[in-house]
Amino acid sequence: MSGLVCYCRQGFEPELAAELSARAAFVGIAGYARTQRNDGYVLFVCDEAAQLAAKLQWRELIFARQKLVVIAELKGIDPKDRITPILAALDGHQRFGDLWVEHPDSDAGKPLAGLARSFGNALRPALRKAGLLTDKPQLRQPRLHVCFLDGDHAVLAVADNADSAPWPLGIPRLKLLPEAPSRSALKLDEALLTLLTPEERDALVKPGMRAADLGAAPGGWTWVLTRQHVHVTSVDNGPLREHVLETGLVEHLRADGFHWKPAQPLDWMVCDMVEQPRRVAERMATWVREGWCRNTIFNLKLPMKKRWDETRLCLDLFEQQAEKSLIVRAKQLYHDREEITVLAMRE
């Protein structure tokens, strides 16, 4: 088959399928999505897979943790010899710079983790012997992915290192530090890692910058910013953890974060308030339109139904009401739940 395989959060396959279908149609490439709920991945079948992959940048896809171009789908693999059919499917292919053997992050896929680990150790030397894999990882070469969907069913796919998630399964392995005020700190950590390039992070998140955290309590997102030596005004009627205040970088204002506005423009505004997504999108747009912040990261809590439609509506609403020339990226992060995280920055 020809097409793309994209990983996603279990249960969000319909949203990813709808997104891929809409984006493919927008760039004029015909295709269809193949998936089932709770699979943890979507296969988008199309004849122009390489062209579609080039037009759908990984950072621009909202519900895709990873984006890969399919080489082959192998079914009915003999468990006693999985290597031979894989080598046959790759015959004549260019050399790869790395190998990742994976499985979907789903209830059905997680039991395949042991197989993925052990099979990777067996496949790697076989690929090198066949001249299909470099001796050491080479970022300039495409990366081979073998994704086991079952013990006898695998998808072979290729990733461009410059346009794919740099983590197996598309999941950054972040550790929740003991001093983190809440697990939500991982969301902002992941957002900064995923939505910004390394060059953008260096340029846009600098010591001495000023930020506001709306709905800050107990201080997870504020704490992440202080670790970057950013001065934070934390706005919430609720309390912050004492050690967050002790950094000397935090001013806690007991106020309604949804209505507060700064006295002077800030470098950043971040917001993880539990509110209706359209209301949040409109308020975030006001912050950008009025020049109260240069850049923002905020979360949109999605409804149980029609989540792709609501996502498009909220992002369109935000961009229309912001009335600024912006770079907008959105992702359903690994540490997100029924929500997406949005980055908006000045061009």
UniProtKB/Swiss-Prot annotation:
List of residues binding S-adenosyl-L-methionine: S184, A217, P218, G219, G220, D236, D256, D272
Enzyme class: transferase
Primary site of residence: cytoplasm
Coiled coil: none
EC number: 2.1.1.186
Molecular-function GO terms, alphabetical: S-adenosylmethionine-dependent methyltransferase activity
InterPro entries named in the record: RlmM_FDX, RlmM_THUMP-like, RNA_MeTrfase_FtsJ_dom, rRNA_MeTrfase_M, SAM-dependent_MTases_sf
Gene Ontology annotations of biological process type: methylation; rRNA processing
Function statement: Catalyzes the 2'-O-methylation at nucleotide C2498 in 23S rRNA.
Protein's name according to its UniProt entry: Ribosomal RNA large subunit methyltransferase M
